[in-house]
Amino acid sequence: MSDHIQKLLPYGYLYLVVLGVVKESIFYYPLDINILKYSSIMDILISPIADLTSYPILILFFIFLGFVLYFFKKYLLKNIDKKSTRKFLKITEDDTSTKDELNQRADTDLIMIFFAMLVCFFLGFGIGGGYKLADRIENGTLNFEKYSQTINFNTGESKEVMVIDHNSIYYFYVEKGKKSIEICPIGSIKSLEKK
């Protein structure tokens, strides 16, 4: 791994933190939940990774995207004399950049493209998912037949619910027949039965 990419890794970590906070906040905004009050910092940090691992096709897509960008970089550096490549890398006629400097420039540009695609994906996922879920709750069109679960509480009470989400501290769910989200601490739940 080049020194340039190693220097960018701390920014990647900071990027992941900010991306997690923004994505979670945007997802829960239409549901009138300030998720930062109900989450630990670890929940926020791992939320982008948790979303990716929830849908294996997304992992494959981002791995594929990484390979595409890698081979695109190889193509750029191999065809450095082409007008389109020079324009993409912002190389002027009197530019005296070395091959290493051009490699570094290509790395930076392609990493920024990858980060921009991640932002677009997670913002779209947060906005679309949050508003769609809020609409389904409001209209009573949640698919309880397919996704319902039974929560058994420590008190002996049981509820048929659709779990919206959970983190290390709380469960967020909609009880069958209701149109509001309930938030329950994990410690008060004895078991969760999936149907």
Q: At which residue positions do the language-model features occur?
A:
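Juxtamembrane/interface segments at transmembrane-helix termini
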Residues: 75-79, 129-136
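Terminal membrane-proximal soluble interaction domains of membrane-associated proteins
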Residues: 135-195
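Phenylalanine-focused residue identity feature
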Residues: 27, 61-67, 71-72, 88, ...
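Residue-identity detector for glycine
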Residues: 12, 20, 66, 124-130, ...
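Cytosolic juxtamembrane regulatory segments of multi-pass membrane proteins
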Residues: 48-50, 89-113, 148-160
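N-terminal first transmembrane alpha-helix
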Residues: 1-103
